[in-house]
UniProtKB/Swiss-Prot annotation:
SUBUNIT field: Homohexamer.
Pathway(s) per entry: Pyrimidine metabolism; CTP biosynthesis via de novo pathway; UDP from UMP (UMPK route): step 1/1
MF term (GO), any: UMP kinase activity
Signal peptide: none
Protein name (database record): Uridylate kinase
Length: 252
């Protein structure tokens, strides 16, 4: 289904390691230091990073979360229906997608925004055939509204979209530089993993992604890499053969 990881050194031609990627951005990442809302500086920084990838010929699909605009947990504990809460979360991802598309297009990067929920006149409805055509034409494609169904996380949506568009890898951007055996923020002695198998992630309960997302990647042999998006140039370095974060893939 997927092309898999290719280990290749950086070369003078700056040939990318991957032809097509699915990048998962959390909603919190868009909030920057504010912790809520959308930080224009973050949008500009993300646009710059993605523009560099497009410039070397990488086809980029994006899935964005919505946690910077809506968190359903507190309301659900107060009695909000889970399905209603999940639908509100999906709408938050659409707002983030609109902001991302605007930022990318202001940087002269041709971008499509596709929603799993039909929103005529606002965004294009998701169709994997059209998404593949857009990617082949060199356009960045942002996928929003999750899977379109409640009870599924945006991490699961990212893995699903990555599989559907035959991405070479799913890249999860986080606030830390990979996967650790404990929370590195709380435990300074936490040990980072350079590589893991899907089964090790599940057995060790490392919390890289939810169970559904990890199982999707495992069952379809989709490599997953967790890296620090806040590290300037990390994404481009990954594309050019550098080692960033933690790679999760099938056992060799």
């Amino acid at each position: 289904m997927s092309g898999g990881e290719k280990e290749m050194p950086t070369n003078k031609e700056r040939s990318p390691r991957y032809n097509r990627i699915l990048l998962k951005l959390s909603g919190e990442a868009l909030a920057g230091e504010e912790g809520f809302g959308i930080d224009p500086k973050v949008l500009d920084a993300i646009s710059l990073e993605i523009g560099q990838l497009v410039g070397i010929g990488v086809q980029v699909g994006l899935v964005v979360g919505g946690g910077n605009l809506f968190r359903g947990a507190a309301l659900q504990s107060a009695g909000l229906d889970r399905v209603a809460g999940d639908h509100m979360g999906m709408l938050a991802t659409v707002m983030n997608g609109l902001a991302l598309r605007d930022a990318l297009e202001r940087s002269n990067i041709r971008t499509r925004l596709m929603s799993a929920i039909p929103m005529s006149g606002v965004v294009e409805h998701y169709d994997h055939r059209n998404a593949n055509r857009h990617l082949k034409n060199g356009e960045v494609v942002i996928f929003c509204a999750g899977t379109g169904n409640p009870f599924f996380t945006t991490d699961s949506a990212a893995c699903l979209r990555g599989i559907e568009i035959s991405a070479d890898v799913v890249l999860k951007a986080t606030k830390v530089d990979g996967v650790y055996n404990d929370d590195p923020v709380k435990n300074p002695d936490a040990v980072k993993y350079d590589a893991l198998t899907y089964d090790e992630v599940l057995e060790k309960k490392l919390g890289v992604m939810d169970l559904t997302a990890i199982c999707l990647c495992r069952d379809h042999s989709m490599p997953l890499r967790v890296f620090d998006m806040n590290k300037k140039g990390a994404l481009l370095n990954l594309m050019l053969g550098g080692k960033e974060g933690t790679l999760v893939e099938a056992a060799q």
